Amino acid sequence: MSLKGKTLFISGASRGIGLAIAVRAARDGANVAVAAKTAEPHPKLPGTIYTAAEEIERAGGKALPIICDIRFEEQVQAAVDQTAAKFGGIDICVNNASAISLTGTLQTDMKRYDLMNGINARGTYLVSRTCIPYLKKAANPHVLNL
């Protein structure tokens, strides 16, 4: 299946697997919304929404970098609406954003757990739910949860 002209909304697409999916889709000529929190370079982690957008466009796609923290409903709604307005809809929702803890259960405090749950469970649900009205209008819609 070609992704030419299809629009992907990808959470957490500024680096890693999300960026790899975005660049691969761009090679087919896809439109990609890069919805992530990283707008400024991080000293330990590569990539921002803007560097990701540049990579997507170099690969042949169209990019829309959007600052978005998926824990917040108003940010997700604005990002999804902005994507649909720019590209005429959304065909694929990729839930890639995540938070992890490399500590054991007894060493993971509740603040860290709440962050992980807020992004990994609630944020994934929120992004999917917000994209669904647009996905229902697409010819062959998909939701990918990573």
Model-flagged regions — what are they?
Residues L3-V34:
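Canonical Rossmann dinucleotide-binding motif of NAD(H)/NADP(H)-dependent dehydrogenases/reductases
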Residues K6, G61-K62, G89-I90, L135-L146:
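Active-site loop of short-chain dehydrogenase/reductase
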Residues A30-T51:
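Conserved glycine-rich Rossmann-like NAD(P)H-binding loop of the short-chain dehydrogenase/reductase
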Residues G104-T105, D109-D114:
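Substrate-binding pocket helix/loop in short-chain dehydrogenase/reductase
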Residues G47, I67-A79, M110:
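The beta1-alpha1 cofactor-binding region of Rossmann-like NAD(H)/NADP(H)-dependent oxidoreductases
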Residues A59-K62, Q82-C93, S101:
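A glycine-rich helix->loop->beta "capping" turn
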Residues S128-R129:
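A short, exposed helix-loop element centered on a Lys and neighboring polar residues
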